[in-house]
Amino acid sequence: MNFLVISGEFPPFAGGSGTYCNYLIKALAARGHKITLITKHYKENAEQEKKIDLALSEQNIKCIRMPYFKFTFIFSWYRIISNYLKRHNDFDFVILNGNIAQLVCRKPALRKFLKKYITFQHGLSAYDTLDKNRFAALFYKRQMLDNFFKNAAANIAVSRELKDKLEQSVKMPNLHVILNCIDNEAFTFIPQNKDKNALHLTTASRLIPGKNTIAVVRLFTKLRNDFPNLYLNIAGTGSELERLKEEAERLQVTPFVNFSGQLNTKELCKLYQQSDVFILLSFYESFGLVYLEANACGVPVIGSDVGGTREAIEDGVSGFIVPLDDENIIYEKTKLLLSDTALRQKMGNAGKKRVDEKFSLDTLGKNFEKLLNGLKAEEA
């Protein structure tokens, strides 16, 4: 089949939405589908972007990058996408991944070019953007979004928890679930020559308030009283970076904290492989891809008991799910993993097996094709 995929997020800089899109198009291309991607241009990462786009072209994926300006993208993207669809309107489906793509394409004048479209939801959807962004609210009405999602061939949530939340909060119709998956060929377990005299606790995410990385820094400081050989790796960039550095300085742990910055897939995989425990204490996750990535590299994980984390982590098997409001439990579970090598290996191995069996690119491709076959059957 021939797909046009429109996504506001995509590597080199991407959160869960962009990463999911990257995996989805690779999974579909591997199964013989034709893919054209329209996404954001990152001028500050132009060289890395070129490498990513070259790799996509080698998989027969065409990538079109568009400039993004926070307050005017609605108009510029609308014009570019409309003109493109006027010239190329032979797609079987248009996939609209995330809020930006859905806000742009919900316009009636553009929707007439969208014969069949499928939306992917990664959070509280475009409704949330509308509620928070006064500028967007000037041009979009809630009823327009209601009609937009009603007319979609399918609306897909990346976790069962998110599906339930969308049905309850905005009554989104025609919702299906296709769980997040990862590239388990890129994230693999390779035994590393780890420093036997050191332990490494790792976290990776966008460094924004919602990821609650500051709680990890404070937990790490407390754990160093038990493990003087413990080091903390923080991968990612974002608005919280300077605050985190200041907190590490205040707690006098700066020499033991490594801020890795933004890492590509290969670098992130290597970081996981060198880690003993992965932790992310977000206030909310629609799923939590990083838990799967770490598990795929043989690392046990700890995540907060929120949202789709409950589906990403099998509690007591691939890691631990901990309550955000109980610092003692978070501390005790992390301490347990750091102190028990056999338990770390057991959970790391179980996590890797689980990812390979349930969350591979092949699984993602099969699940999406299964959905498409169901849509065809409904039409017949």
Named regions from a protein language model:
Residues 137-155:
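Membrane-proximal helix-turn-helix segments that form the acceptor-binding/catalytic region
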Residues 262-263, 270-275:
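Short alpha-helical donor nucleotide-sugar binding micro-motif in glycosyltransferases
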Residues 283:
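Aromatic "clamp/platform" in nucleotide-sugar-dependent glycosyltransferases that forms part
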